[in-house]
A protein has these predicted regions:
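Short acidic (Asp/Glu) patches
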Residues: 47-51, 64-69, 92-103
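Residue-level signature for short turns and capping positions that connect secondary-structure elements
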Residues: 23, 50, 70, 119, ...
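Alpha-helix boundary recognition
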Residues: 10-11, 58-59, 98
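Short beta-strand segments
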Residues: 14-49, 57, 63-68
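Helix-adjacent hinge/juxtasegments
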Residues: 53-84
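Charged, gly/pro-rich active-site loop segments
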Residues: 74-138
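Extreme N-terminal tail/first-helix region
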Residues: 1-17
Length: 138
């Protein structure tokens, strides 16, 4: 079970940075609005199939995600680093995304979901450099 503090951090934010890699090993990143499915522990976002990151996810589903609180106050630094597997989203994922972003209901959406295999939360509000780690293998 994912620590509540990790879940709460993910739920409080709405933009992630998605990292993918090309077939020849070249990294790429893209910012995406996301919704979090707590029940399935998945991050849901949209991406047109023509985008570079979507094309790369089709070739290699292993991705990384970063979500960060922007602050200059060291004692408030928080962020997650996530490794996971991307897949095409389903109708239920679409409903979760539209609930978070109602204006998206009128747009054609290519839904994606990432199932985390590893999450690390750095949270200086718990103590300088304090990290909480979740691993799907444990």
């Amino acid at each position: 079970m994912v620590d509540k503090r990790i879940v709460d951090f993910i739920k409080r934010h709405h933009v992630l940075t998605l990292a993918t890699v090309s077939g020849n090993g070249e990294p790429y990143c893209a910012a995406c609005f996301y919704a979090y499915d707590k029940e399935q522990n998945r991050l849901i976002f949209t991406s047109d199939d023509s985008t570079r990151h979507a094309q790369e996810m089709l070739q290699n589903a292993n991705v990384a995600i970063g979500i960060t609180l922007e602050t200059r106050i060291v004692g408030k630094v928080q962020g997650v680093q996530i490794c996971g597997v991307a897949e095409r989203g389903c109708d239920e994922d679409r409903k979760i995304y539209i609930k978070r972003f109602p204006y998206a209901a009128v747009a054609p959406l290519n839904i994606w979901a990432v199932k985390p295999t590893f999450i690390k939360l750095t949270d200086n509000t718990l103590g300088f450099g304090k990290k909480l780690i979740w691993n799907s293998q444990e």
